[in-house]
A protein has these predicted regions:
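Extended substrate/RNA-proximal surfaces in nucleic-acid metabolism proteins
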Residues: 2, 50-146
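Generic enzyme active-site microenvironment
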Residues: 6, 40, 91
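Flexible loop/turn segments at secondary-structure boundaries
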Residues: 12-14, 45-48, 97
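Gly/serine-rich nucleotide phosphate-binding loop at the start of the catalytic core
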Residues: 1, 21-25
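Active-site mouth loops of central-metabolism enzymes
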Residues: 9-22, 138-141
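Histidine/acidic-residue-rich catalytic or RNA/ligand-binding cores of hydrolases
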Residues: 15-18, 49-53
Length: 146
């Protein structure tokens, strides 16, 4: 079975994103496009994490699926050719802006987490460094190596 993945997503809690982004619409769009694995995006944002916890169920190790009652409604009216399984992997993009050796540095890192518990631990650690609730894509003064 071929795997087609989009692993760099954001939630509606990130700047310059659709206010309509939710897990049922992501699930439906993935089916329409033949995508089998989607990143959740913005796992460190507290409001989005609540939606992750209420919208997704564990599937295979490190992957999640849309809850059946949400999936049924999201799939309504799709052509039969759009069938298949969609999985989600817990993911966040961290924007790092910092100085090193007297020079300004900017980079973005995609972080993938294997479980809700790992995501909570990661979020708790980052919360000591910056404000995670202000944007789904946290901007931290942190060297990527740290």
């Amino acid at each position: 079975m071929p795997l087609i993945a989009d692993l760099h997503l954001h939630s509606r809690f990130s700047r310059a994103t659709s206010r309509d982004l939710d897990f049922p619409s992501l699930h439906r769009a993935a089916l329409e496009k033949g995508i089998t694995i989607l990143g959740t995006g913005d796992v460190t944002h507290p409001e989005w994490m609540k939606e992750i916890e209420t919208s997704l169920d564990p599937a295979e190790e490190g992957l999640f699926r849309l809850r059946p009652e949400l999936a049924g409604a999201a799939e309504e009216g799709l052509p039969g050719a759009c069938g298949g399984e969609v999985r989600f992997v817990l993911q966040v993009e961290i924007s790092n802006i910092y100085k090193k050796d007297g020079k300004g540095r900017k980079n973005h890192n995609l972080v993938f987490l294997p479980s809700l518990e790992a995501a909570r631990r990661f979020t708790d650690r980052l919360a000591t460094i910056g404000n995670l609730a202000s944007d789904g894509r946290p901007i931290l003064g942190l060297d990527a190596r740290d």
